[in-house]
Amino acid sequence: EVYLQKYIEETNKVISFQKDCGIEVIVSGELNRDNYMSYIGEIVDGVKLLTLEELKELTGNNENFRKSLEEMDASDNSMNSPICFEKINTEVRLNKKEIEVLKDSSVEHYKCTLPSPYLLTRSMWLKEITGNSYDSRNELGEDVVKLLRHEIRELVKEGVKIIQIDGPILSEVVFTNSKSDNSFY
């Protein structure tokens, strides 16, 4: 309850700042997110949020894991990653709380962001764990797309003016580690 109140207060500050700057399409500031996609692990049934140390224990290939983290400048164990442990619930709302706060603050036009299906699938796939529920990363990806399509439909119904699909490290993933079975970023 205290966290929720603080989240709402700080989000309202972000909204006020944007309005004061003359920004016409407002964003929440994503203050409820550890990073651009880890919040999925807190919301979606079938997904758990794991620390990099927990991931390292599950993979068994510590050297490749360490290298992949160094390549992505994430070796300080400050990042959490959503990992799929069972079939995911594709009907859950991802950005419901963000939208409620935006609506409650009388914002006329607002934007919402979602992680890209490719990076979300790639992050959630851990062969040693996810392979027990999905036959392939592609099969998991199909459910991730269903999840995102469901959220997009709901966002449109709620009047979201812009929906941004984030893939901030996509080029690095594609060009540096495209053949990896597991990735942690």
Task: Report residues per predicted region.
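Domain-level signal for soluble alpha/beta catalytic cores
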Residues: E1-Y185
